[in-house]
Regions:
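Acidic/polar surface patches and capping/hinge elements
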Residues: 125-130, 140-186, 196, 212
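Short, charged low-complexity intrinsically disordered segments located at boundaries
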Residues: 77-84, 117, 135-137, 200-207
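Short, low-structural-confidence N-terminal segments
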Residues: 1-72, 166-225
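A structural motif
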Residues: 111-116, 134-142
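Hydrophobic transmembrane signal anchors and adjacent membrane-proximal interface regions, especially
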Residues: 15, 109-112, 152-156, 198
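Contiguous hydrophobic segments
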Residues: 38, 61, 92-107, 144-169, ...
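N-terminal targeting/tethering segments
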Residues: 23-130
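Alpha-helical transmembrane segments of integral membrane proteins
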Residues: 6-9, 128, 132
């Protein structure tokens, strides 16, 4: 799962089910527009492998329900990734070499067991680590910029321990008001905005929100104490 998974899968499923499971009548029905590009139901459809995998987790849901949940989640991911990328581009947010190297050193520690794995060629593994490092450093830098611009709640998520969900909400609302994206299907629309506006049970105390250093550097420092 990527850093655009703002809402945990099970919570997202609960939202969708509570709103009612309805899919567009036609498989190619246009359900949203994102930066002047139409998004059809067809392009959001999950693979059968993904349906089977998540149905093994959401055991009380039918295949149809799981497929709908994944389709709506795919739309949320597409909007999230595109809006965050646009925000980063407009604000010229890119990690510097030191930030990427810092992330790389941590990722190398996390993946040290792969060094002796014959399934991974040395050069291929290094490209993977560098790509992961760049993505992680940029994600932290975008989160930092969003929090500094909008404030709001920050929560822990597996792929981003400092996820500024309050800032996400304000950013998405601004992009919606500017017409940068619109969701036509009422159920998709309700599910997306319910997930964006979700109130988390556990949020960081404002005094403990610190973007002065990348979160992985602080974690490593704490582990060494």
């Amino acid at each position: 799962m990527t850093r655009s998974n703002v809402i945990p899968m099970v919570l997202f499923a609960a939202i969708v089910i509570s709103l009612g499971i309805n899919t567009p009548q036609a498989a190619n029905e246009i359900i949203a527009r994102l930066f002047n590009k139409s998004i059809s139901n067809t392009e959001l459809q999950p693979s059968q492998a993904d349906v089977d995998r998540f149905q093994s987790i959401l055991t009380d849901k039918s295949e149809k329900e799981v497929r709908t949940i994944l389709t709506q989640r795919a739309l949320g991911n597409k909007i999230t990734e595109s809006v965050l990328a646009d925000f980063a581009d407009k604000n010229a947010i890119e990690p510097n070499e030191g930030e990427v190297q810092s992330a790389y050193s941590v990722i190398k520690l996390w993946t040290v067991d792969l060094d002796g794995n014959r399934e991974f060629l040395g050069e291929e593994l290094e490209r993977y680590r560098l790509a992961m490092a760049h993505g992680m450093a940029k994600s932290w830098k975008v989160s930092k910029a969003l929090y500094e611009a909008y404030g709001g709640d920050v929560v822990f998520q597996q792929d981003n321990p400092l996820t500024p969900v309050g800032a996400y909400q304000q950013l998405f609302e601004q992009y919606r008001e500017k017409g940068e994206f619109v969701i036509y299907d009422p159920v998709f629309k309700a599910a997306f905005w319910s997930s964006v506006k979700m109130k988390y049970a556990k949020t960081y105390d404002p005094d403990n929100i610190d973007f002065s250093l990348p979160w992985w550097e602080k974690s490593m420092t704490a582990a060494e104490k």
